Amino acid sequence: MKAPVNSGSSANKQIAPEGTHVARCYQIIDKGTTFDEKWQNRKRKIQFMFELPMELAVFNEEKGEQPFYVKTVFNLSMGEKASMRKFIESWFGKKMTDKQAADFEIFTLIGAACMINVVHNGKEDRTYANIMSISPMPKGMQCPPAVNMPMCYDTTAHDEQVFIMLPEFMQEDIKKSDEWLSRQSQSATSWSKPNYPTNNFQTANTNGQGLTDDLDALFGSSDDKNPF
């Protein structure tokens, strides 16, 4: 997971501070299957983004204070040794059975709170904020209301309304995926208007309360969420 800070026009960009932070998952994006240069094979990747509601800064004068964010990317796998499975198990402080892992619905993690440990790593003239570890929220401790609008995207169940809200560079990456190219190939021979699901989430207000109510309606109380 990378968040460049000192490169070209990004020289003054702020990144999440080091340390242990209260966090909430607000975005999960399936990036599809592309060629992995490191491993020299094709891998399907998924990205998780977390807001840090107690760490605020002004990134845009018109918007005022907003929370920092951090992100991490995994291979889309819930195998016993898979990094994503270990990450989710650490998130909730509980081991999964193979059946639980196979049945686990990843998008249920949207809105889930946690504690994350952020470290800074440098490479050449850049500094990155990385998630070193994740753990459950301590008992009795609450995560502040959500600020960012929750978002999830699945390359095998394309939602144009969500896709157009993604950054352009991410859209371009997804368009290179096997899933996107396969869908384009199929639609070239048989096209019909997709039935996009309705997004029932409200846009967050200044304190995020309306959005939190929506999340609680879907997943229950913000406290002690455990999807497995």
Language-model regions, residue ranges each:
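Short beta-rich binding modules
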Residues: M1-F228
